[in-house]
Amino acid sequence: MAIDNGKLQEEEASSVTRFYNIILGWDYKQLTKENERKNRKDSKEKLNVVKNTYKDVDDYFETFEPLLFEEVKAQILQNKDGEEASVCKMRLVMECNEGEGFHFLLVTYEHEEDEYLAQNDLLLLSKEEVKGNSFPSSYGFAVVEHRQNNLLRLRMYLAEDIVQITKNTKSSRTKSFIQALSNMRSLITSSASPIDKRVFSLKLCGLSTIIREYIALRSVSSLPFKDLIFTAAEKSCGFGDEAWKISGPLNEFFNENLNKSQKEAIDVGLSRKSFVLIQGPPGTGKTQTILSILGAIMHATPARVQSKGTDHEVKRGIQMTIQEKYNHWGRASPWILGVNPRDAIMPEDGDDGFFPTSGNELKPEVVNASRKYRLRVLVCAPSNSALDEIVLRLLSSGLRDENAQTYTPKIVRIGLKAHHSVASVSLDHLVAQKRGSAIDKPKQGTTGTDIDSIRTAILEEAAIVFATLSFSGSALLAKSNRGFDVVIIDEAAQAVEPATLIPLATRCKQVFLVGDPKQLPATVISTVAQDSGYGTSMFERLQKAGYPVKMLKTQYRMHPEIRSFPSKQFYEGALEDGSDIEAQTTRDWHKYRCFGPFCFFDIHEGKESQHPGATGSRVNLDEVEFVLLIYHRLVTMYPELKSSSQLAIISPYNYQVKTFKDRFKEMFGTEAEKVVDINTVDGFQGREKDVAIFSCVRANENGQIGFLSNSRRMNVGITRAKSSVLVVGSAATLKSDPLWKNLIESAEQRNRLFKVSKPLNNFFSEENLETMKLTEDMEIPDAPLYEDESLPVAPYGGDDDFGDGDADQDDVAMAGED
């Protein structure tokens, strides 16, 4: 069915207009007052709670649109008083025009100071500089449209009419704000000279991602599988007739190299179901499964091909030598070699565009007759890091073709902040390569139009495109003449539903949602939206509604003693250990009970304290000191652990993480980042280390543990380690929560619960270590459960050279710490 691009663009423009009519009409002063109120029951009563299923598009939209705008409000106010608060900049209004109900301004732009400004950034424009909690006489929101002749083009909505979000919304403007808008309108439209039309701008936040989410939300009614999204039920489409199959060699390879649950996930995908949900618990080979799915769907063919009333098996091509394959790849991927695509012999429509499946690049007509066109796949993830992990794995291991031979397909990674390890396939790099080859040729220029043409050619020829969820809604992909047949979303449980909708608008026919609702959810800034279920991912919602989910069950990361608790607590005991995983994860330091594989250290005399600033984050200095003792003892006895690639320190609280980093910088200077990896729980999802030390922080008499009670945060925190996870916390405080009580009791049952008294360094004395040493013929010694005797003090020191330095890592921003 043909896609009416004109209609799509018209609908998108309508969505953008409505979005800015609402956002730009808000009163910043009123928003700050609402935010200061501790209890916002009045707002929550107007919001629909996210449900598992919906009657129709109106029911769906009336739920999500108000929640999305609540999130916008929270993002606007997020940095108001924080460390990242912006500074007011004075600008001159050079020109002002009206159109479509908006005012469009051209204001002065300072190149060096304004580099931080980007399209869709939201600004507060005012007559006077905004200082503290005082508000100027004239103010209003403005959004950055683009740069024009060394000027910034801004959009404002200064009409007195307010655009309501829903029919139940009863918003109104105060008289003071109406006057402020009137004053601003008079200022920017006056005939005075620019020097007399000074305004101040304050950057509040970027809106690019959330406006893409809004456009996707508004276009949900045009999706071919909208009914499935609403009802979580897929209509019977006779999948048996439409199912695809893979070649014998490729199927044999998967049978030999994948476990049962991974192979079943591929089979579900080949059934051609519109939505395929794959749950990947920690260490179950989720990324490998995604690569296998890519290999399968790139080379799948209809199970039977009808030809003149007779069923025929699909023809298979002959094998090529590796040199012949590389020769063909060079022609099929011209930008890699700097060749002009128009000068190259391009693969015929129907070829996969890489190593020819026909077995003969000179006879493309021998390509499988059942493949009418080359499949295109869009692979997305919520974050750059999650996306680049897949790209890197694909580059390092490749895919398998129908002959089960390894090859590297034509791929392109679009968007910002690509990791340096995948830069070779980034769009910018490929364009630069192509431009370089063009410059060397006579009569060839590199105008803006030429660059756009190069980008388009690269995207059109790539079989797999990688983009974050947000960037999949960029104009770059929207300009493409072709959509995508398949969309694969990794870490799908970490995305709010509107974000998941963005890549689905690319005309795809099949969607794979891969993730784990038992691990970290999406970050939602607004507590009002969070309480209404806005953080629920589409994956989780469909799963709750009963949509079938294929779970990967064999884990290849954790020692069985680490796997035991999360499997029972979060996955109903379904996780199995890969072959020889115990032998692969057993280490020399396991001869001591206190070094794993699974331990809980009860710092029963520790106390938490709160960050003096407005962040609300917490720190526990006793836990900091004890973790340093663990680290020192481990790396002194086992020097191979003195590496950030081997050992991690994890904590849910930013303040605790910062304190750890400061202490390690004091000890190791510029080498700090090399000797240990320190980050928040949120910053460690999807990663693994040999040893992980988890600092819980919370220790108080009231048994309050804040967001530490989040089961997903616990699951991620304790499943990062391959050989040893060492949990440090206050047993008395944590036992107030049923989940943590279960974990502590699990440690106790395994004789791996240690009570640590002050002075803390007594615990790792030579004498005490001997009591915790396992003999060769026993796994759990007959040793006291709690170690609280007064023992000689072990010297805290060593051969390390301590120095000064300022190396640090960026903290992962978290919302709602408490």
Swiss-Prot record:
First-level EC class: hydrolase
Disulfide bonds: none
Region (Disordered) location: 781-818
Binding positions (ATP): 280-287
Keywords: ATP-binding, Helicase, Hydrolase, Nucleotide-binding, Nucleus
Compositional bias annotation for Acidic residues: 781-790, 798-818
UniProt-listed Enzyme Commission number(s): 3.6.4.-
GO molecular function terms listed in the Swiss-Prot or TrEMBL record: ATP binding; helicase activity; hydrolase activity
Record note on disruption phenotype: Defective in female gametophyte development and micropylar pollen tube guidance leading to zygotic lethality. Reduced size of nucleoli of polar nuclei in female gametophyte.
GO biological process: embryo sac development; pollen tube guidance; pollen-pistil interaction
Tissues expressing this chain: Expressed in flowers, siliques, leaves, roots and shoot apex.
PANTHER family: DNA2/NAM7 HELICASE FAMILY, HELICASE MAGATAMA 3-RELATED
Protein name: Probable helicase MAGATAMA 3
Lineage: Eukaryota, Viridiplantae, Streptophyta, Embryophyta, Tracheophyta
